[in-house]
Swiss-Prot record:
Belongs to the CUEDC2 family. One of its GO terms (biological process) is negative regulation of macrophage cytokine production. CDD domains: CUE_CUED2. It comes from Rattus norvegicus. This is CUE domain-containing protein 2. GO terms for molecular function: ubiquitin binding. Disulfide bonds: none annotated. Keywords: Cytoplasm, Nucleus, Ubl conjugation pathway. Residues 90-125 are annotated as: Disordered. Controls PGR and ESR1 protein levels through their targeting for ubiquitination and subsequent proteasomal degradation.
Length: 267
């Protein structure tokens, strides 16, 4: 992760310096892993024609950062040289740290008279005390154990008690809010009350007291009644009436009766 971070920061700085208008969205973990894999085996000596293909590197970077190929080749070589040196030094530091960690892990505990007492106290210590001490740095071990015991092991309730200051604490303790920073103390009742009233109380304005009365129309709409020949269309409630136009005799003469002729049966 540390090596990839070095590669990403170096590439971002290089592209922003020489291509200010370039799109950096193409620089992702894939190209970082590629550059790290290419420069991993170069060492502090840097790239050369035998162990490094500069053309392939530029072509690969051009695919992820359009315009990278227009940068001068010598500038790219200097960047690759500097980056390979940084990676080599970071890799050496990481290699030196590993034996130290192994020594610390394999180192036996110091044989003191209080070792057994400390181990017993650590076993008896509740698991949530560490969390409380991390959240409230100014809180002592005794205070954290007291609040956690009052909360019956419930970590969330213990944190809430410390923030709100509901727990008085053991004798000789002036209260949890005494040692807490201002940002972790609960708001004062007066401040909380004024804040709630200011944000949520009703605003009494003259507009709220007015009763809205819409204006009546100047002229009422007229009732529409349809007449035919000065008579109401219908008084039975029908909405429509079939009105047929009178037909002339000439028009009637053109009609054809398609009714079949009556059949006569003779006995």
């Amino acid at each position: 992760m540390e090596l990839e971070r070095i590669v990403s920061s170096a590439l971002f700085a290089f592209v922003q310096t020489h291509l200010p208008e370039a799109d950096l969205s193409g620089l992702d973990e894939v190209i970082f892993s590629y550059v790290l894999g290419v420069l991993e085996d170069l060492g502090p000596s840097g790239p050369s024609e035998e162990n490094f293909d500069m053309e392939a590197f530029i072509e690969m970077m051009e695919a992820y950062v359009p315009g990278f190929a227009h940068i001068h080749r010598g500038i790219i070589e200097d960047m690759v040289q500097t980056l390979s040196v940084q990676l080599s030094s970071a890799r050496n530091k990481e290699t030196l740290r590993r034996p130290e960690k192994l020594k610390e892990e394999s180192r036996p505990p110091a044989a003191t008279g209080n070792t057994q007492d400390e181990a017993a106290a650590a076993e008896e210590e509740q698991p949530g005390v560490d969390v409380l001490l991390e959240v409230f740095p100014t809180c002592s071990m005794e205070q954290a154990q007291w609040v956690l015991a009052k909360a019956r092991g419930n970590l969330e309730e213990a944190v809430q008690m410390l923030i709100e200051g509901k727990e008085e604490g053991p004798p000789g303790w002036g209260g949890p809010n005494q040692d807490l920073p201002r940002r972790l103390r609960g708001p004062r009742k007066e401040e909380l009350k004024s804040f709630i009233l200011q944000k949520y109380m009703m605003v009494d304005r003259a507009e709220d007291q007015k009763t809205h009365r819409p204006m009546a129309p100047k002229e009422a709409p007229k009732k529409l009644i349809r007449y035919i020949d000065n008579q109401v269309v219908s008084t039975k409630g029908e909405r429509f009436k079939d009105v047929r136009n009178p037909e002339t005799e000439e028009m009637k003469a053109t009609y054809i009766n398609l009714k079949p002729a009556r059949k006569y049966r003779f006995h």
